[in-house]
Amino acid sequence: MKIKNSLKSLKTRHRENRLVRRKGRVYIINKSNPRFKARQG
């Protein structure tokens, strides 16, 4: 999982990327291609 300051550019890297908020953190998840997972921090 990548940890980035800004997820804006990562969101557009793949069509199926989803932006979710869990426990005050912002994540990008991708079920079909998990290598695009990222967390903002």
From Swiss-Prot:
One of its GO terms (cellular component) is ribosome. Keywords: Ribonucleoprotein, Ribosomal protein. GO terms for molecular function: structural constituent of ribosome. It comes from Sinorhizobium fredii (strain NBRC 101917 / NGR234). Transmembrane segments: none annotated. The lineage of its organism: Bacteria, Pseudomonadati, Pseudomonadota, Alphaproteobacteria, Hyphomicrobiales. This is Large ribosomal subunit protein bL36. InterPro entries: Ribosomal_bL36, Ribosomal_bL36_sp, Ribosomal_L36_bact. The keyword NAD does not apply. One of its GO terms (biological process) is translation.
